[in-house]
């Protein structure tokens, strides 16, 4: 079984002060491009994901030399830098000074930050130890936009892998996990 050969992890990470950064396509693209880079160069195997306005969820495994924590660290570091640059260089960003002040204030007095802190700290990958737990997490990730009242069906949300699990092509490449027969029809609602 696929589950015997891979270690699956889940992680959720949010912007500092839950700032709604991902309401503009330019910022969503920075995040998506960064995930793609990690898929191509860091061994990130993405199984489920969802990007909300101020946080992201990933269910993933890895291949190659980088650990789950290494991949997450690099993804967060790269997206932080690129998203701050995108905000600074966006002439039509009406919230620019407000957002940059929040990220600058959060970055002050932090040893591991030079200027800004974009993501909240202390979010570590959690190992998903069984198929049941893995699919509970995947269902949770996919239902995030439904629970938030953004869409009525999970697969209608663009920045999620829910559509991939229904046989449609999503924004990012996803390695779909097959739900074991024993879990068929067991969708967890939140």
Model-predicted regions and their roles:
Residues 1-190:
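Short catalytic/metal-binding and nucleic-acid-binding patches
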């Amino acid at each position: 079984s696929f589950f015997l050969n891979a270690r699956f992890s889940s992680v959720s990470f949010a912007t500092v002060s839950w700032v709604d950064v991902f309401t503009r396509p330019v910022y969503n693209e920075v995040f998506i491009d960064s995930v793609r880079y990690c898929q191509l160069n860091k061994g990130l195997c993405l199984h489920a994901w969802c990007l909300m306005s101020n946080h992201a969820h990933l269910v993933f495994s890895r291949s190659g030399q980088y650990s789950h924590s290494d991949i997450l660290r690099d993804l967060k570091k790269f997206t932080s830098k690129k998203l701050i640059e995108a905000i600074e260089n966006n002439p039509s960003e009406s919230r620019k000074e407000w957002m940059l002040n929040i990220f600058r204030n959060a970055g002050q007095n932090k040893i591991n930050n030079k200027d800004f802190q974009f993501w909240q700290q202390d979010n570590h990958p959690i190992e998903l130890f069984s198929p049941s737990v893995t699919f509970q997490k995947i269902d949770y990730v996919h239902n995030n936009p439904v629970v938030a009242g953004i869409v009525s069906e999970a697969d209608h949300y663009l920045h999620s892998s829910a559509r991939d699990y229904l046989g449609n092509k999503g924004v990012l490449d996803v390695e779909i996990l097959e739900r074991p027969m024993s879990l068929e029809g067991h969708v967890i609602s939140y």
